[in-house]
Amino acid sequence: MKDERLVQRKNDHLDIVLDPRRAVTQASAGFERWRFTHCALPELNFSDITLETTFLNRQLQAPLLISSMTGGVERSRHINRHLAEAAQVLKIAMGVGSQRVAIESDAGLGLDKTLRQLAPDVPLLANLGAAQLTGRKGIDYARRAVEMIEADALIVHLNPLQEALQPGGDRDWRGRLAAIETLVRELPVPLVVKEVGAGISRTVAGQLIDAGVTVIDVAGAGGTSWAAVEGERAATEQQRSVANVFADWGIPTAEALVDIAEAWPQMPLIASGGIKNGVDAAKALRLGACMVGQAAAVLGSAGVSTEKVIDHFNVIIEQLRVACFCTGSRSLSDLKQADIRYVRDTP
């Protein structure tokens, strides 16, 4: 029965996120408040622009991550297959959705070594929630998640707001930081910690860095609001009223990124949450990210075909290249030095 409830919850989440009329939020990721200074004399050949980078010791053609979306339900099998095939073609990284259901049910449902066979040359990131980490069970779950897809790293997602609003959610978060510290010591792969759409503050980032986390994904407000999603799933008007108040809650992605990058400029950061296009991606990279992630924005394409996913990211890549060209940036290292200004008042 527990597995059935988890599977139904995953299916509910997919249905809601795929419908643009549902789970609406007014929160902004904040990138519209930043503006590049246009370079009218770039003095470079567009064809010489390179977006190559290294992430988790693998060479990528662009600093893009297919962010964690779905896992553990039958319908996610073809979604993850399309994403993995596209990641391999494009040479970009891929994170899978939570593997909790797959581990507890012993049913991979596409979250297995098939993904590594489909994407042998790119970083694959396993995924578990912080709620699954406490005690020895947490270490076992983490190892199984990594082994299941032969992952290059494990993502631990932090979602206290969603858990607080979700019927039956985990509201006891004591010991989660200690569990993360233990995983850093015990796991044979790097640990990536991310939020799921409410952002990571400078204070929490400091705690994670002190714990030994390798990468932080700020996953800020401005994209999918899981509070709004849980509001849509609510069984009672009272639950809905509580959840909907938090639809716009969180630290905007750009703000979280700048705060952490200023304090720890050498810390590898992923920017996700409301990245709508290649210009947002360029701004995120300039503001301190080493990688940029998208999830919901590509979910519709992933449900159709590998080619649709490739087409989607090729648009993002071309937009990013144009942004480089018009800031006089031949490479990502040049882009990180491009002139950018904070515009307080936006239309």
From Swiss-Prot:
GO CC annotations on file: cytoplasm
Cofactor requirement: FMN; NADPH; Mg(2+)
Record GO biological process: isoprenoid biosynthetic process
A Pfam family: FMN_dh
Molecular function GO labels: FMN binding; isopentenyl-diphosphate delta-isomerase activity; magnesium ion binding; NADPH binding; oxidoreductase activity
EC number(s) given by UniProt: 5.3.3.2
Family in the record: Belongs to the IPP isomerase type 2 family.
Alphabetical list of PANTHER family matching this protein: ISOPENTENYL-DIPHOSPHATE DELTA-ISOMERASE (PTHR43665:SF1)
Task performed by this protein: Involved in the biosynthesis of isoprenoids. Catalyzes the 1,3-allylic rearrangement of the homoallylic substrate isopentenyl (IPP) to its allylic isomer, dimethylallyl diphosphate (DMAPP).
Protein name: Isopentenyl-diphosphate delta-isomerase
Species in which this protein is naturally found: Pseudescherichia vulneris
